[in-house]
Amino acid sequence: MFALCDVNSFYASCETVFRPDLCGRPVVVLSNNDGCVIACSAEAKQLGIAPGEPYFKQKERFRRSGVVCFSSNYELYADMSNRVMTTLEEMVPRVEIYSIDEAFCDLTGVRNCRDLTDFGREIRATVLKRTHLTVGVGIAQTKTLAKLANHAAKKWQRQTDGVVDLSNIDRQRRLLALIPVEDVWGVGRRISKKLNALGIKTALDLSEQSTWIIRKHFNVVLERTVRELRGEPCLELEEFAPAKQEIVCSRSFGERVTDYEEMRQAVYSYAARAAEKLRGEHQYCRFISTFVKTSPFALNEPYYGNSAAVTLLTPTQDSRDIINAAVKCLDKIWRDGHRYQKAGVMLGDFFSQGVAQLNLFDDNAPRAGSAKLMEVLDHLNAKDGKGTLYFAGQGMSQQWAMKREMLSPRYTTRYSDLLRVK
């Protein structure tokens, strides 16, 4: 038995938790460089605002409607997500963190001693008490059904109190008959059009199809979806995320970059962040690549995009090695006379910690004390905030940095941003 817990309007809700004065007002969160809307509060959705709308086109409309806009505060969202997930882990035997605002919970054995709907309400109340965030809870025998139950809990929140238990077969079928097939988890737009052409309009229609025919005309993934809709578990709970095969750190610049030194600072920063992520995965890498590009949509400007890569003989997780390799790649592809829109660093060819072997012919032998130095670097930046300790090459006044003109305070991770109570 699974429960899917999903925070309602997560990004927007994180902003309003610390701003009670915004209660009842429409709130939107913008993407990198304040480009477009990526999250809306319920009040904003009622005004017809949808994710993907360019901010510069809607700016005047937002002003007239009293919409409050925020730049993306990823540090705040990550910490609030961690608080939600920690709460869930205390309440259920196992948790799979599916995304920043969603988690599948294992309810095996819970129904033997608790009513599942009551337990769902307890999850909701506990998360609300500890984080002031509201979650929808969908309970069912499979992940796919739990997704649909969660969808119903949020769509009909007033009638369901935010909790839907689909363990009853009759209730399952009634809900499946109401859900369009395109709203089923794992059914994309292209597949849903093909299903509609075959007369399969609802989730119930899909659940009643022959698995053999579905597999023959579509694929094994959709066959699993059909089985899951019938209450047959095909997707197990994954407590540990699979090891990453690559790490990419890139951003569009707040302003176009034309100066090599500014680009070098950006590549320094992206490489340092990628190395930090690599150590967080307990991995070493051999492949380091840097890319730069101008905007493909710029008028009267020639497009330029290029990348270069370095393969090390000995795997590393030292920021200094990765930065040096990334800058060497930049030197190969940098061309004067362009207005660059974006750059990034990619790491690949990973080795697990303790598996990496030295190479007799490698001129760049591992640095003495590298592991301890990187540990201190990561510890200070985790304890006192990102950027507490950084490389000089990253620069101090980063003109190229991502534009976030409406950034809220990092209320939960920076002492300087703690709320002051009068």
From Swiss-Prot:
Query: Where's the UmuC domain?
Result: 2-188
Task: Return the InterPro entries for the record.
Answer: DNA/RNA_pol_sf, DNA_pol_Y-fam_lit_finger_sf, DNA_pol_Y-fam_little_finger, DNA_polymerase-Y, DUF4113, PolY_HhH_motif, Rev_trsase/Diguanyl_cyclase, UmuC
Q: Per UniProt, which keywords does this protein have?
A: DNA damage, DNA repair, SOS mutagenesis, SOS response
Q: Which GO terms describe its biological process?
A: error-prone translesion synthesis; SOS response
Extract one GO molecular function annotation from the record: damaged DNA binding
Record PROSITE patterns: UMUC (PS50173)
Q: What does this protein do?
A: Involved in UV protection and mutation. Essential for induced (or SOS) mutagenesis. May modify the DNA replication machinery to allow bypass synthesis across a damaged template.
So what family is this one in?
Answer: Belongs to the DNA polymerase type-Y family.
Q: Which PANTHER family match?
A: DNA REPAIR POLYMERASE UMUC / TRANSFERASE FAMILY MEMBER, PROTEIN UMUC
Record-given protein name? Protein UmuC
